[in-house]
Amino acid sequence: MEMAFSANDRVALGKSGLKVTRVSFGTAGLGNMPETFGFAVSDKEAEETLAAVFASPINCLDTSRNYGMGEAERRIGRAIRANGGLPKDFVLATKLDRDFQTNKFDASRARRSLEESLETLGIDHIPLLHFHDPEYASSLDDVTCKGGALDELFKMKSEGLCQAVGLGAGRTDIMMDLIKEYPFDVVLTHNRYTIVNRHAGPLIDACAARGIAVFNAAPYASGVLAQGSATYKRYVYQEATDEVLAPVRAVEAVCAKHGVPTGAVALQFSMRNKNLASTICGVTKPEFVKQTIEWASYPIPDAVWNELASVAFSTDDPEATRTYVLG
């Protein structure tokens, strides 16, 4: 049997000076977006979940202005105040987001996005700041031109407003181009490196070759690999047909045969990749915080991995046909 992982082992984020645990927590669900996830999250649930996160050994929390149109950040800000500040050596990450009305994403919008986040979170700087979803900008030239939004991101780093900068997006082709032109400390990919999809594999390898740390978010394909396809019939934020869920059910069958949780296998599949610094798991209840930490170190027999090696997986973009719903 392969040695179990520990969720709280820490990994350096390149040369940034930051270290994060092998598992991080995500807060998209805490933005209360039932159209995206299929369920709502109350203020009380969010409060209890964030208190559990701050009390846990996990030291990294990922959020965005885009999660519930600022609702996730508002809830995190309240939790930070209730906690008397962030825990020691805690790495909070947020993202620069475009103007949600116009999709404008120039330098002034990038600056304003950070100002909005810092004000909402109640802090004066952020450990990790990602540039979020450039593919949805009204003009990619506003993002990449001289004096554009990405230049502004690195300017804010030089001003000490953040310690490390990253790129968090969906489209890996755009990300591949940008990592060749800008010295990101970190890249964040989501839903594109799971036990049933390896679309982001080439991006992850390219980042490793450049010394860029990689966060892999949504190892459960937006929830189905954790909650089970029998009751959660969604895949990558959309309702899913039996055909779409077939690869998930093939994995579930192997896990059931060996008596191991599919969620633990899905999480550790990501953790086994040495080119991934941390795996981001969304949490919306305190018990999910505890469960994630347990799954990270759940003993999984070698026979499971051997059998799963023959299960088919996709390399297509799993969000290619997704109908995007803002916030």
Predicted regions and their residues:
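Short, acidic/polar
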Residues: 39-53, 105-120, 171-177
